[in-house]
Structures are given as structure tokens and as C-alpha cells.
């Protein structure tokens, strides 16, 4: 599904409750988690609660990208003045971001409520590890490809906006030889 936007058209979440239920509906059908206790009175139903978790996951994912060395290199900024990623500038691979958000919601918020951490072979503990691994794989893939962010905000991702890296030429001296690294 496409990103969730507010009335102004700004992205507020990469996924919604239907995306989460589509991937892991057994947890909800088997009623393994008493969500009436988990959801605060501020939410009218389970879908609103899950939508709120999806919004939290987007914030955490954007922060993880911002904290990566990839973002520092991509923006050319130092650690003290890093700009935030703008979710409205993500123009490609939106389904990958939706999947990554669902994996994050499941591994961090929903499955830990049902998991029995005392039993290592617990199905829910195994699922947490599974979704955690899938999340990390997708995160690393998005960093490696880096063809999804519209840096200049013109509505398209052009070749010049894709990740470029620069290496400084330096000399390294060993005992018997000199190596030039580019």
C-alpha cells in the first residue's frame, strides 16, 4: 500500500494496520494478545492502536537512517548538523519502506507482547528474530542501493541524486613499500 498521508499530503507513516494484519494476521485471529489492555483509552479500536505503532515505527526508521554513516556521507554533513530525512522525498521503493515498517512494528511492538522469552524455542521469539533479520536486510539493501531519495525535492530521483561516495587520496607507508589508495 502507499504511504499514509495526512490532510496536507505529508507522509505520517510508511504502513498502516492493514499492512501489518496482512503480514501476520494469525497473532490477531488467534487472539494471542489481549489488545484491549495494551491499547490505551485514547484509541477507539485495535486498528487505531496499530496505526499509531506504524507512525512510531516510521519515526524510528527515519532516525536509524539519520544515525547511519551512509546519511552523513550522502548529505555531506557532520554529526552535529545532520539534516532529518524527509519522508515526503522518498520517491522510489515505497513498498520496501512499507515492508520494513511492518517488520519493525512486528518485531518491536506486537510480537514481544505475545512472546514467552523464557522459552527460547517459542514461536514468537523465533518470529521476532526472523522479522528483525528481515528488517536489517532491507535496511542495508536500501542503504546500498540509495536510489529512492529525492534530495533536491523536484519530484524525481535523478542519477546525480543517487548515492555517491568520495575518497580522499592518501598515502600509506609500510616497512617495505608504499601503497597509494584512491
Regions found by a protein language model. Name each.
Residues 52-148:
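Internal mixed-charge
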Residues 1-95, 154, 161-182:
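Conserved short "hinge" loops at termini or chain/domain junctions
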Amino acid at each position: 500500500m502507499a504511504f499514509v498521508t495526512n490532510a496536507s499530503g505529508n507522509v505520517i507513516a510508511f504502513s498502516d494496520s492493514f499492512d501489518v494484519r496482512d503480514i501476520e494476521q494469525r497473532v490477531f485471529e488467534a487472539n494471542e494478545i489481549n489488545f484491549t489492555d495494551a491499547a490505551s483509552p485514547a484509541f477507539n479500536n485495535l486498528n487505531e492502536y496499530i496505526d499509531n505503532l506504524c507512525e512510531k515505527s516510521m519515526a524510528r526508521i527515519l532516525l536509524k537512517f539519520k544515525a547511519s554513516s551512509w546519511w552523513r556521507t550522502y548529505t555531506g554533513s557532520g554529526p552535529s548538523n545532520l539534516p532529518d530525512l524527509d519522508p515526503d522525498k522518498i520517491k522510489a521503493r515505497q513498498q520496501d519502506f512499507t515492508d520494513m515498517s511492518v517488520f519493525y512494528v512486528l518485531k518491536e511492538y506486537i510480537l514481544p507482547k505475545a512472546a514467552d522469552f523464557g522459552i527460547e524455542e517459542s514461536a514468537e521469539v523465533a518470529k521476532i528474530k526472523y522479522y528483525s533479520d528481515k528488517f536489517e536486510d532491507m535496511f542495508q539493501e536500501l542503504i546500498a542501493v540509495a536510489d529512492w531519495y529525492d534530495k533536491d525535492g523536484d519530484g524525481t530521483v535523478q542519477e546525480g541524486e543517487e548515492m555517491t561516495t568520495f575518497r580522499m587520496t592518501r598515502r600509506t607507508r609500510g616497512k617495505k613499500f608504499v601503497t597509494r589508495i584512491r
